[in-house]
């Protein structure tokens, strides 16, 4: 039994549940299926905040949601690049390598970032300090502002961005925030 529910698409919904299979809740439990708040490809910090935003959507006003988003945006800009990066699995690196230009046209963005990372690790002779990304690795990728030291809009990494790349000041927090937080929320709000 739920007092509110939003269906975004088939198998993608959120509900304010008061009674689930005979178990009653004093405070409604938020049940979420198929939305970015529960997807592993969303940064962990955003998963929690998307759930909180959905709670605000279900139980509060539009003004409260606007304030919540604005407050989180300020916090988001202070987080480390590693915290705001998109997690992904990396496969088929060999398929997309181009010896002339690092990567081929049509390369998925996270693979492109991994190939750029590997290129600059080898170019700067940092392979003893940082492991190369290989097929099957769990990685994170970030959008970058240009111009920057890797001359591209993305970089991937395994655990942290090598400080030798000098990229921390080029992280595109606006794009990261839009893609990791506001776009998933907009998808929910558009269906209301």
Residue ranges and their predicted role:
Residues 2-192:
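DNA-dependent DNA polymerase catalytic subunits
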């Amino acid at each position: 039994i739920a007092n509110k529910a939003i269906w975004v698409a088939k198998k993608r919904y959120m509900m304010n549940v008061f009674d689930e299979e005979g178990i009653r809740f004093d405070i409604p439990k938020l049940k979420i299926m198929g939305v970015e708040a529960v997807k592993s490809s969303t940064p962990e910090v955003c998963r929690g905040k998307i759930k909180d935003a959905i709670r605000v959507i279900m139980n509060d006003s539009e003004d409260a949601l606007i304030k919540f988003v604005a407050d989180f945006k300020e916090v988001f800009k202070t987080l480390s690049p590693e915290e705001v990066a998109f997690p992904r699995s990396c496969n088929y690196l060999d398929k997309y390598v181009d010896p002339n230009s690092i990567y081929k046209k049509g390369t998925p963005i996270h693979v492109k970032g991994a190939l750029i990372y590997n290129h600059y690790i080898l170019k700067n002779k940092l392979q003893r300090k940082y492991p190369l990304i290989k097929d099957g690795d769990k990685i994170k990728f970030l959008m970058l502002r240009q111009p920057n030291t890797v001359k591209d809009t993305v970089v991937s990494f395994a655990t942290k961005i090598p400080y030798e790349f000098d990229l921390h000041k080029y992280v595109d927090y606006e794009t990261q925030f839009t893609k990791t937080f506001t776009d998933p929320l907009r998808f929910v709000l558009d269906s209301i």
